[in-house]
Amino acid sequence: MEYIIKSILEDIINNVIMSSKIIGVHINREKTLKKTIEKLYKYGGNALQIFTSNPSNCSPANLDKYIKEYESIKDLQCNFVIHASYTINIGSLDPKQMKLNMNTITTDLIIANKYKAIGVILHVGKYVKNKPEDCIKQMKVFMLEIIEFIKDNNLNTKIILETGAGQGTEMIVDIDDFNNFTKDFDKKYFGVCFDSCHVWSAGFDIIEAYNKLKQNIIVIHFNGSKTPKGSLKDRHEQLFCDTNTIPIDKLTTFAKNLKNVMIILETPNEDEYAKEIDYLRCV
């Protein structure tokens, strides 16, 4: 029985590896990263998005732990991307907070380099109670410092900025503003993460917005949206359910346009991952 299960798992893994599409999920971590990757294989995925530390605070990851754990997974076929903590605000004007943010993100970049990950994803900054123009300037300075860190340390990974939903005081939510903010960054060290839920919630057509940004897009967060277009809410939804407000035919057309990018599902129900990954492979 154990041999049969092992054989089935090996067949799944081989089929996933042979696929030319890089598709995966952000799933809750198992006890070990190796077990998490094995779970990913069962869903039919070959890409994994992870947090390296608690996403609800800005504390840097345990670098030594991740360097050691790499030895247990280095022979497995898996494409990684790291998502930085949700609480990091790269538009903050607080020097102490910015220093902590820098430490946390540079640690993630070192881990990303070790794991041969495509990069580290950041959310756009928030101005909170400050002047938006001051915070946008600071956000630009921060991004350039991160790019300089990657360059100076010869890291083979990128810093990736994710499109915003417009929730709260998020900045550069408008697609043209986002494009203008990012267009001059060195593409050797920088890329864009396009989130279909965020863009829809921000009030934009996902296909039109994608076409404006596609030259810099290296990761897609392929999500449905629980809230209507233009709601300015970050509420992800499964792809195939009545409460997804993005029409499935639009998502299908969008998926057909995606070439040479990593696609990550952040939909809320793990029971649907196998079905959703299969859908993305077949379109």
Name each model feature, range by range.
Residues 33, 66, 70, 101, ...:
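Aromatic/hydrophobic pocket-lining residues that form the small-molecule binding cavity
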Residues 12-84, 92-107:
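N-terminal pre-domain/capping segments
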Residues 75-76, 90-191, 201:
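Active-site acidic/histidine proton-transfer and metal-coordination neighborhood
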Residues 273-283:
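C-terminal helical cap(s) of enzyme catalytic domains, especially alpha/beta-barrels
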Residues 26-30, 53-55, 85-87, 125-127, ...:
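Active-site beta-loop-alpha junctions enriched in small/polar residues
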Residues 92-95, 171-179, 198-262:
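Gly/Pro-rich active-site loop or hairpin
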Residues 23-27, 48-50, 80-84, 120-122, ...:
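Hydrophobic faces of well-ordered beta-strands that scaffold small-molecule active sites
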Residues 39-44, 64-81, 108-114, 148-154, ...:
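Acidic (Asp/Glu)-rich catalytic clusters
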